[in-house]
């Protein structure tokens, strides 16, 4: 199969088309900023909903005594309308990783495979996939003392740290989640996000402000037409 031609917009950044994750994110942000319009998102009532409709396993009894937190797509339901995702991701300190796996195995969970990053994909007795991520992030200790709860009462990563993770990801879905969550965040929450990003990834501040702009623009009420 012939390779796709590299579009001129991308070729100006990476002639061979091999964008870094940060370059890829910048291209997406630039396109969105050119196209975003007030009120292009869902209704305000829908956007305010926080639900826990999807029945993810409750790991609290199994992992009692160990610090853990939900990350990934399931975590976003604490900050925006719930969306479908194929599995539940949890983040634990790498020093607790083997203990977490052992506790889950004792509860009937099975290891499917190793993850591309440090950790394991596991399957619950009901067939639900759980990705157990062993974390060594410089912000991990701070994050674990600033936990939030989702509508089901499960421990969820705080918004600033979820933004850090999703901004470092390579999927457009992650960046869409970021702009939506930021668009729905309060001024106080945005200042908390800015402070954490400035501390841990200051090189991402410009992109963060762009994603805030896009998210807030989508939440604006469109102008009425006579």
Regions found by a protein language model. Give the residues of each.
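Compositionally biased terminal segments of proteins
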Residues: 2-226
């Amino acid at each position: 199969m012939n390779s796709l031609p590299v579009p001129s917009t991308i070729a100006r950044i990476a002639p061979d088309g091999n964008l870094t994750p940060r370059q890829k994110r910048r291209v997406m942000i630039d396109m969105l900023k050119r196209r975003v319009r007030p009120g292009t998102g869902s209704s305000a009532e829908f956007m305010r909903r926080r639900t826990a409709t999807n029945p993810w396993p409750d790991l609290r009894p199994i992992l009692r005594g160990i610090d853990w937190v939900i990350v990934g797509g399931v975590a976003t339901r604490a900050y925006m309308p719930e969306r479908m995702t194929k599995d539940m991701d949890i983040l634990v300190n790498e020093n607790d990783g083997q203990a977490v796996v052992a506790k889950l195995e004792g509860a009937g969970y099975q290891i499917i495979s190793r993850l591309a990053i440090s950790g394991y994909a596991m399957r619950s007795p009901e067939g639900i996939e759980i990705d157990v991520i062993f974390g060594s992030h410089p912000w991990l200790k701070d994050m674990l003392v600033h936990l939030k709860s989702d509508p089901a009462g499960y421990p969820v990563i705080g918004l600033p740290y979820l933004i850090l993770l999703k901004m470092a990801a390579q999927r457009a879905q992650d960046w869409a989640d970021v702009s939506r969550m930021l668009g729905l965040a309060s001024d106080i929450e945005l200042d908390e996000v800015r402070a954490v990003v400035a501390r841990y990834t200051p090189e991402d501040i410009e992109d963060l402000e762009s994603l805030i702009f896009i998210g807030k623009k989508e939440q604006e009420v469109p102008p009425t037409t006579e």
